[in-house]
Amino acid sequence: IIAELKRTGWTFGSHTWGHINLSSSSLERVQADTKRWLDEVGSLVGPTTILYYPHGARPDGDDVKQTGPIFRYLQEQGFRVFASVGISSYSKIKTDICAVICDRLHPDGTTLRGNDKVIGWYSQFYDARDIIDLTVRPNRGVKWTPKTN
């Protein structure tokens, strides 16, 4: 599967091995997790320069001018693009260590079932009320207001 995805142009990134919160984890935990990701996942998908922050949690918080030890360690491991979670287009180039900080949308089952505000964030791409199949997991419910015709 990985070979076919690569052949058809897919790019892989890391989301850490254990989905750890990078803003509250110790450097030692981040190092152990990163090693495990490189050994068990990176060895399959190949090198990547992209790290998608689990929970959207930046290791240096929201201060893009700060470059602490965890961020530096991750950069030393080859990561250059660091993507958090956000609803607007955001990017910052950190010229002191050659890194791009940006936000990304994360459409998933949770956002498909979110309230009107949440599904509004994705309305430029789709309307959750038109595409979600509620018969698959009927007991999960939704928080949005049904469409009126």
Spell out what each predicted region is.
Residues I1-T8, P59:
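Active-site beta->alpha N-cap acidic-glycine motif
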